[in-house]
Amino acid sequence: DFDSIVERKHTHSTKWLKFSDPNIIPMWIADMDFACPKEITDPMRERVDQGIFGYTDTPDELTQILKDRIKLRSGWDIEEEWVVWVPGAVVALNLACKTALAPGEIVVTPSPIYAPFDDASENMARGMVKNFLIDNNGRMELDFDATEELLSKDTKMLFFCNPHNPGGTVFN
């Protein structure tokens, strides 16, 4: 719904709290000012109305839906045990650094990138090298030659954001 205005300035919104100047339109964070669709809010209301917020398991069918989507989009048939559900991308980035890298090992991170990608290796006391994106007619792209030059015996992981944030480049 692009026509309804949702006032968020007094809701502790990170986006709107950053700048006090009312003439600044904050576009520094991927936080949209659109109302959430009823298909999402109605089931949430049902859960709230139930009045109990105990522990919840991830529905088995959700993993199968993910497997089917990956197979459809990429032809890759993943194993169910490869899927680990986490509460968000930032948690996943930190877990990836902690579990896939030993101390002293390095992740290659495109730059610029959403800050939590940069933060994850530091949070987990792992190494990082930046692979600076190149401008190709206004489109931010990976420099594959530079990526190859950054590889070493200690490089064990490449962070990848698709679509890329910032810039919006969709890699395929």
Identify the meaning behind each predicted range:
Residues 1-88, 95:
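N-terminal small-domain helix-loop-helix segment of the aminotransferase-like
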Residues 53-172:
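Conserved core of the PLP fold type I
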